[in-house]
Amino acid sequence: MPRITREINKFPSIYACAAQRIFNLDKLQSSYPTLDKFLSDHGMKNAEGFKRGNRKLTYDGFDGLPIVDAKEFYPFYMPKEILLNNADNTFERVSNKNLPIFKAPHLIMKQSHRKGRFFASVLDYDAIFNHSLLGISGEERMLKYLCLIINSKVFSYYHLLTSRTWMVERDALEAGDIRTIPIPEPSEEILEKAVELYEHIKMCGDESLLDAFVFDVYRLKDYETYLVTDALDYIYNYFDKKSNSIAFKKPSIEVYRNYYSTFMDILRNSLGQSFTPKASFYIGESPLSILVLSISENNDGNLSFFDNNESTEQCLSQLDSLLTEERYNIYIRRNVRVYGKDSIYIVKPKQEKYWNYSSACRDADELFSDIMKAKG
């Protein structure tokens, strides 16, 4: 480490600390009102739908109305013609204090997810639904704005981080959890864009601009949008697929290259553009991969890959057994950074979750922190 820090000291543009690339949940929560307050401020009713339950209540107000079925739910819009009409007037409760949620225009949200995504639709006709769906009544433009947010990655990501029960005890969000998500107050310009985008998606099903719009509404930085995507791609996929998750997939050369590109971009922003160590990956047959940064050699612009060295394979296999720990049938595999005289070695399992964008950000920040500590 001393030789490395002497090399690092040559860079004039170094600064004292690196900004941690994390999704600032506290800032998000303090910047915008919760959905609950947002709805209250705009005079919008919200509640879960009716419950059949014990059927002790007879109510004729829903006779002949279309019923939205959670099992046949579609995002953004559902034509009235595809729904069955209600012919049963017995209930346990009918959300009597919030009957406007069944009147058009209204937003209906499915509280359970489909492959990590939540769905909401805005309907321009009266319809009823049961307590597995959440209804919101209010001004139509606001409903379409909220519909875009609920259908977006940001909505799923927020609840992935904050929900007490989703993917732990149950597959659905509780209404109370849904109401905690921060909602930015839209300007007239944002509302116009939201309506335009909603109508575009409703008409042709093209959702390619959805997440970019919502990222912009929440003023997320580029790296935050990547963190959101990584979390849903890897964390949710792990909950869903378990051992078959892409999180455990062997990284491709492209994955390693993308990791290295992000990793070096962050380090150069911290240490200066003159920080150009020679870099190489060892990706043989062992369960571990190694990124080697040779501080004393300048990068010739090429990222090298090696995959066949018997002594290295033997060493990595032994190291893997030392880094793998079993506790109560849970396997823990540790990551290692080794600081040699002239080189830095980053040793991690050969699984995609350790070589994605989020990992590159975290590794670069931790490496920078180690260097700063060594500098004193």
Language-model-detected regions and their locations in the chain:
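Conserved structured core elements
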Residues: 29, 103, 127-130, 140, ...
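Non-catalytic DNA-recognition/assembly elements of restriction-modification systems
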Residues: 2-51, 63, 68-73, 184-376
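Hydrophobic, well-ordered secondary-structure elements that form the walls
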Residues: 109, 152, 181, 218
